[in-house]
A protein has these predicted regions:
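Conserved SAM/SAH-binding beta-strand->alpha-helix loop
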Residues: 82
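Conserved SAM-binding loop
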Residues: 89
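Conserved beta-strand signature within the Rossmann-like core of class I S-adenosyl-L-methionine
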Residues: 177-185
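A short glycine-rich, Lys/Arg-flanked "PGG" loop and its adjoining helix->strand segment in the class I
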Residues: 163-177
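S-adenosyl-L-methionine
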Residues: 1-54, 62-71, 93-138
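Conserved glycine-rich SAM-binding loop
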Residues: 59
């Protein structure tokens, strides 16, 4: 299925896309040594010494571009599973690097500021949860951005939702002390699911947990844990914190993604929170 994102023009991810040479296929050695597949993604950037942030589900790349332009001192890795969206986002970044017109600008209200080099942005076509689990070394990521992820509303698809025990365990592992998982969604059922997990993984000294939502999501989470059990933390590795709007967001926005702008026009409600690594 094609979404026609290129509007008849071939999409060219170019050097923005992480290549197979940079991320070779995992060898069979990971069956006996899980660390054998680890690769430091900081090496994929022009300045590997900068802090690293990861966006899960970059879509058309709007947040990634805006945030990277606002924070040139930080490296950003966008991960997108849908190939056409991955190619489209990488192509947008490549064109802005080259000073070419951004074909999305007029429709998604992306800042009309002069294009910057954006050498601090790379795109990866992968399953983000699996990439973080098998590839990312301990303690190297400052922020994981998770905005408007697929809610997978059917019960048989709940296992595909990003927030799970395994994901939260791996996020805690790869984040630096004080690092963050930043979450925004418009989907009430997904928020209930997420909140039920947050209750078990994050301390809540400020009363930020949506306890009503967590109670609604508890049955689905309990069923998921019975079917695919994963060890629970002995000590909660996160602390819940309020969500502060992103620097590149427009007036009244939280992060400024394409989905957020679309859903705001539709009058939808939003939920947001930060999990900070203790």
């Amino acid at each position: 299925m094609s979404f026609g994102l290129g509007r008849g023009r071939a999409l060219e991810p170019g050097a923005v896309a992480v290549s197979e040479a940079e991320l070779p296929p995992m060898s069979d050695a990971v069956m006996t040594d899980p660390l054998a597949g680890r690769v430091d993604p900081r090496a994929w950037f022009a300045d590997p010494g900068r802090p690293l942030e990861i966006e899960i589900g970059s879509g058309k790349g709007t947040f990634l571009i805006q945030h990277a332009e606002q924070h040139p001192e930080t490296n950003f890795l966008g991960i997108e599973w849908a190939r056409e969206f991955f190619e489209y986002a990488a192509d947008r970044i490549r064109r802005r690097r080259a000073g070419l017109a951004d074909e999305e600008t007029g429709r998604d209200e992306l800042s009309a500021a002069p294009a910057r080099a954006l050498l601090n942005v790379r795109m990866l076509h992968a399953d983000a949860s699996e990439f973080i689990r098998w590839r990312v070394p301990d303690g190297i990521v400052r922020v994981i951005h998770l905005y408007f992820s697929d809610p997978w509303p059917k019960s048989r698809h709940h296992r595909r939702r990003v927030v799970q025990d395994r994901f939260l365990a791996e996020a805690a592992r790869v984040l630096v002390p004080g690092g963050e998982v930043r979450v925004v969604t418009d989907h009430a059922e997904l928020w209930a699911w997420d909140s039920a997990y947050f209750a078990d993984w994050a301390e809540d000294p400020s009363g930020l947990l949506d306890r009503e939502a967590a109670a609604r999501g508890a049955a689905d989470v309990a069923r998921e844990r019975r079917e695919r059990p994963v060890g629970m933390p002995g000590v909660k590795p996160f602390v819940m914190a309020p969500f502060a709007r992103s620097a590149g967001a427009g007036e009244g926005e939280l992060v400024g993604t394409n989905f957020e702008r679309k859903y705001r026009r539709e009058g939808r409600a939003f939920w947001a929170v930060v999990l900070r690594r203790a």
